[in-house]
Amino acid sequence: MSEPTKTDPIKVYDARWETDEFTPLEIRRFIEAVLIYGRGLGVDTVTIARDARLGSGSVMEIALKSAVQAGFTVYLCTDPISTPQSYFLSFWASKDHPKTMGLTITASHNPANYVGLKVVVPGVQAIGLNCGPDGGFAKIREIYHGSETLQLGAGGKLILVDPTERYLRFSMRAAGIEDGELEGMKVILDALNGSAGPELCRALQQAGVSVLPLRLIPDGTFPSGSPNPTSRNKMDEAVALAGKTGAVLVIGTDGDGDRLVFGNARGIMNAGFASTPILRKLLAGGSASGTSLPKPAKIIYDPKVNPLALVEWAKLDIKPVLFGNGHSQIKEHMRRIGALAAVEESGHYYHSLTTEGLTFFAENSLVTVFLLVKALKENPELMGNMWALQDRVFTTGEINYQMADDETRDRALQAVLQYFKDDHAVLVSETEEGIDLLGTIVCRGVDLDAGKLESDWYNGYLRAATNEKSVLRFYLSAGSFDLGMQIEQKTRDIFGRYPGNAID
């Protein structure tokens, strides 16, 4: 095999690449590096799953062939499933094979021309760059660029599986939901042609929910664009349908089903507010996690969760814990501090799940959805209460700009940060524990320790994207709509001075 180039598919959270960016030979070398890493951890079993995107099939073929030839027992799900279901598959295999590694072939909410890989190691522990045993993807990168080869092994075995029914039952038990319990509830489900639509629809119907689906069929071409429900206007059709049908809840999910948005006929809610009834159910024992809860319960939040939501969380006897973006990194931090859950404003909800003696930390979109629908059934006024809070906050949603190159991106980033410095904002780039936030919080008039917000408060988060080339991401919340719109326009004006374009 020829030497791989010094570039590689590895990013901060996982691996992600455009389908024409690397040759099949390079992808095979990358998969082999992952398996060499796993073998060093004592792995003997590998689960392999995929989402619906078109590039996933060829990567799955390479992964399957490499793993079986190397002597691993492989549990393979060939049908497109969600990333949360793939984590369950790894958990299920771990019951009989504790040294299981899970490979999920996905590029999440990225455009159709992307593909990627998420990895969990024994204990269903997610890895990232410098995150996980031996540095996680940092070790895989070292192997990829090194000379070590994957040794062939005897005894390789392929077992085809369909974990959906087991995943559905596991999730219903975890959420404390019985068959038919949510009868009378009507929801709109927009799956954006991702892989999670069928399993979400099936689970909700099993619980008695009337589901009106949109873009339900998995389609890796993503005909309506990037499968990101947090993008502006992406959920407009679902919101309009809720108004016409009287549905109590709108649910949107991304390409691999680990990102959720919630709303109703009025629009889509911030995750900080939508998560509040979910967290309340968790604290009240609405999720059968099997764990006793410390007081106050630690809930991790990312820099984009708006401060007013955090003030509401504190009323629930919650200790909000700031941490940067990064799915693997967040789950590892949950493990370290014993957090009950975590919420990212991007729509990622993480749970601590304990069953059959194993605790693992992962997204489970079925559990998240079940808990919210159950809360709405028990309290029909709940959505109105959440909107009353959201009406007090201006938010931009995620603003994304694709710059001409990384150098241009970095210059634009510094220009925006200088604008906030000149506005006497507080700039924060790490947690109190010194953990890098992988971006910069810009805030003014926010005192979370005292639970106080000034009338002209704002809170923003600015960072360079880790999984896409030359992309800047910005998110803003503010206590004044006029101030929020003013800051948004100023930020867009600064971005516009540099070669590039706004993207979804």
What annotation goes with each model-predicted range?
Residues 2-4, 115-245:
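Gly/Ser/Thr-enriched, mixed-charge loops and adjacent short helices
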Residues 75-83, 268-271, 323-325:
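Active-site nucleophile and cofactor-binding loops and adjacent substrate-binding regions
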Residues 36, 44-114, 202-263:
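N-terminal small/polar loop signature for handling phosphorylated ligands or for N-terminal nucleophile
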Residues 213-215, 267-286, 358-371:
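Gly/Ser/Thr-rich active-site loops/lids in small-molecule metabolic enzymes
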